[in-house]
Amino acid sequence: MSEHQSLPAPEASTEVRVAIVGVGNCASSLVQGVEYYYNADDTSTVPGLMHVRFGPYHVRDVKFVAAFDVDAKKVGFDLSDAIFASENNTIKIADVAPTNVIVQRGPTLDGIGKYYADTIELSDAEPVDVVQALKEAKVDVLVSYLPVGSEEADKFYAQCAIDAGVAFVNALPVFIASDPVWAKKFTDAGVPIVGDDIKSQVGATITHRVLAKLFEDRGVQLDRTMQLNVGGNMDFLNMLERERLESKKISKTQAVTSNLKREFKTKDVHIGPSDHVGWLDDRKWAYVRLEGRAFGDVPLNLEYKLEVWDSPNSAGVIIDAVRAAKIAKDRGIGGPVIPASAYLMKSPPEQLPDDIARAQLEEFIIG
């Protein structure tokens, strides 16, 4: 397990002050989800959350205090309006009252690919000083929801989090928590990070990972496997630009294969986005096939299709990740939060079996 650097713990507050970068479908589901479970009973079990009260923090303790985007239909608008604006097309689960949080113009950098650029209008507002904005809003945790392939932009916001002393939750497949150089930056600064690349509650990756492990545990030789995903949101449109996909494919592939003992040839594992189908909106369809050999080398094949609303499928996981990051911040812990990263992320610094990762995260919550 990685070493953490502990600094004198700041006085813990009763709320988790969150900033969001990238006010897309995932941000919409996150904000709506906090509203949906605002009055949930502490002891109840609700879909998609480890606990209603995660350590000292209830879902309703998550407060959105800042947001950054580049879309002209979102920048300058209240967060409650921006989450339903422009190309956002996820399912609505809750009404959201005005937040008095105005979406600010962040720097574009490499955050907009060619398909995004053809679809949205960029705000002509001047980018704000992100570090100053984080400090002024007294942010505890910054959640990065930038589009896939935003390497430069994600690292820019990661550095802003370090400079502002704000915990960082890296929801996209840019390797920061799992990069030893970046991990050391966060450790040296005494700033916690949970990353990289958020898992869904029950998505293509987790089902594929579990079934591949089931093959191995039951003595079936897994010879080859594939996972194809189609969806209708801006994430899938962005991923038509294959040059932005390298880290996404690596993240999804290692999330499945890292749980297995055997090594695979590159051609025997194909995992990644496939196409954009506009009428699916924020739904994702995953087609997964596993081919193996059972007793006597007799073929044993499994094929399934998973249909989900993509963004709500990870919103609860982010709520847990945010609260884990805040607990680490309260305790003065810097660097990657291994238990939270291993259980909640596809590409953590340290891959652990899911049951062990969950047990370690439960221990972390208790302290």
From Swiss-Prot:
Its cofactor is NAD(+). The keyword Ligase does not apply. Key enzyme in myo-inositol biosynthesis pathway that catalyzes the conversion of glucose 6-phosphate to 1D-myo-inositol 3-phosphate in a NAD-dependent manner. The gene is ino1. GO terms for molecular function: inositol-3-phosphate synthase activity. It is an enzyme of class 5 (isomerase). It holds the Pfam family Inos-1-P_synth. It catalyses: D-glucose 6-phosphate = 1D-myo-inositol 3-phosphate. Belongs to the myo-inositol 1-phosphate synthase family. One of its GO terms (biological process) is phospholipid biosynthetic process. This is Inositol-3-phosphate synthase.
